[in-house]
Structure formats: structure tokens, C-alpha cells
Amino acid sequence: MRQRLLPSVTSLLLVALLFPGSSQARHVNHSATEALGELRERAPGQGTNGFQLLRHAVKRDLLPPRTPPYQVHISHQEARGPSFKICVGFLGPRWARGCSTGN
């Protein structure tokens, strides 16, 4: 009887050593899953795993809200572009924004 029981016990121990996490799989850390659930509720669609959700939540809390870019009102003359003229000077004709009287 003892010889017949020995191989089954050794095989059971071998299986237990090969798969050590299977006995702990029933115990789930519920606090971690609750934290991820809260992050998913706070930031829907921000990623597929918990790290991306946490990173986006931290970035949103640390950075100030963005302001729209500064807008400058441009006059119609500036919108058409600068008015260049051909000025003839000592070095010959050239493009310039405005001709001075000294050329």
C-alpha cells in the first residue's frame, strides 16, 4: 500500500512545485481592482490598461488647464502681405519694402 501511494504523492508534489501560483489564484487583491475601477470611471477611454489610466489621471491633476492660443487681429494691409517695391540704388535694382530718398 505504501509503495503504491508513494508515486502519487510525489507526482502531486511535483505538480504543486511546477504550478505554485495556482493555489493563490483564488485570492484576488480587491483593493487594486477597485482603484482601477475608479480610474476607469474618472477617465473613460483613456487607455486599455491600468498604467495608462493612472498616468493620464496624474497628468490631468498635475498640469494646469490649457488656455487657447493668443490671437492677433491683422489688418487688411498686413493680411495681403508686405508691399515690396523695386528700388534703384547704388548697387542696382533691388526689392525693398520701401525706398528711401537717399538711394
Swiss-Prot record:
Task: List the signal peptide residues.
Answer: 1-24
Q: Which Pfam families match?
A: Sperm_Ag_HE2
Q: Which domain of life is it from?
A: Eukaryota
Q: Which residues are glycosylated?
A: 29
Keywords for this protein? Glycoprotein, Secreted, Signal
Localization, per the record, is: Secreted
Q: Per its UniProt record, what InterPro entries does this chain match?
A: Sperm_Ag_11A_B
A Gene Ontology cellular component where this protein is annotated is:
extracellular region
Function per UniProt:
Has antimicrobial activity against E.coli. Plays a role in the defense response in the male reproductive tract, contributing to sperm maturation, storage and protection.
Protein family membership: Belongs to the SPAG11 family.
Q: What is the protein named?
A: Sperm-associated antigen 11A
Q: Native species of this protein?
A: Pan troglodytes (Chimpanzee)
